[in-house]
Amino acid sequence: MSRSYPGEQVEHAFNSKRLKNWEVPAVDKSQAISTSTGTRFGTLQPRSGRTQFIVDDNGHLKSGVPKLEKSAFNFTQTTPVFMDSAPRWPKENPTWPKNMKATMGYKGIQSNYLPTNTVTLKAVEVPGTTERNFNFM
């Protein structure tokens, strides 16, 4: 047995709620537009002016547009945010072995595609088991 759902039962979640930013406001631009939902922003002033492009079709700055001296991509040595902050990762422990390679599969089962001479896994030698302790480096 099949069920049929009316269109509004499925698609009402996908209907646009506030996508009316392309409409021309009905009031004069000198007046404030009050929000309908009473948000924390109170009344909103309409924006004036227009978007001006600062780059050409190739992505280069147009003439007359000033370059920013400092940005996130060309910071200097005097920037305290990057130079004086604490390191993100701790320093490497010199007592730990450097080349830890696992050549065993799931639960220590020997694999045929990795060599056994590079195993540095820590295991416990249990008498009567077929597992081997390869921690001999």
UniProtKB/Swiss-Prot annotation:
The keyword Cell cycle does not apply. Its main location: cytoplasm. The keyword Cell inner membrane does not apply. Keywords: Cell projection, Cilium, Cytoplasm, Cytoskeleton, Flagellum. It holds the Pfam family CFAP126. It is found in: Cytoplasm, Cytoskeleton, Flagellum axoneme. GO terms for cellular component: cytoplasm; cytoskeleton; motile cilium. Belongs to the Flattop family. Microtubule inner protein (MIP) part of the dynein-decorated doublet microtubules (DMTs) in cilia axoneme. Acts as a regulator of cilium basal body docking and positioning in mono- and multiciliated cells. Regulates basal body docking and cilia formation in multiciliated lung cells. Regulates kinocilium positioning and stereocilia bundle morphogenesis in the inner ear. PANTHER family: PROTEIN FLATTOP. This is Protein Flattop homolog.
